[in-house]
């Protein structure tokens, strides 16, 4: 009796795209605190990257709104930062999907993060 191994298709190499200008937002707090983030996205299809480029203003808008709703306490831990990263990735995928674009952005990375 032969057991067939499921062959996975080799994945395309990753394509990284920077959302360029840092995101700088005031945090939701009584004091004057801000968050600065630099973001890179990863996909394996140039069509996805092209959709990100085309809709960059809308993506930046939605991400700015998401980030400005955070409090210093909510992102002071590694778990909080990871939750924010996952929420940002879901927002990018949602925006692209709502626009009927390919939404297969696989990862979102914070390449810099400063909170003051």
Language model region names:
Residues 1-116:
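Flexible, low-complexity charged segments
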């Amino acid at each position: 009796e032969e057991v067939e191994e499921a062959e996975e298709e080799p994945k395309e190499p990753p394509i990284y795209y920077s959302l360029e200008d840092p995101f700088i937002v005031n945090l939701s707090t009584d004091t004057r605190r801000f968050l600065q983030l630099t973001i890179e996205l990863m996909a394996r299809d140039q069509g996805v990257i092209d959709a990100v480029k085309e809709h960059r203003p809308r993506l930046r808008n939605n991400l700015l709104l998401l980030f400005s709703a955070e409090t210093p306490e909510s992102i002071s831990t590694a778990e909080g930062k990871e939750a924010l990263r996952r929420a940002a990735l879901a927002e990018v995928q949602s925006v692209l999907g709502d626009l009927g674009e390919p939404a297969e952005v696989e990862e979102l990375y914070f390449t810099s993060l400063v909170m003051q």
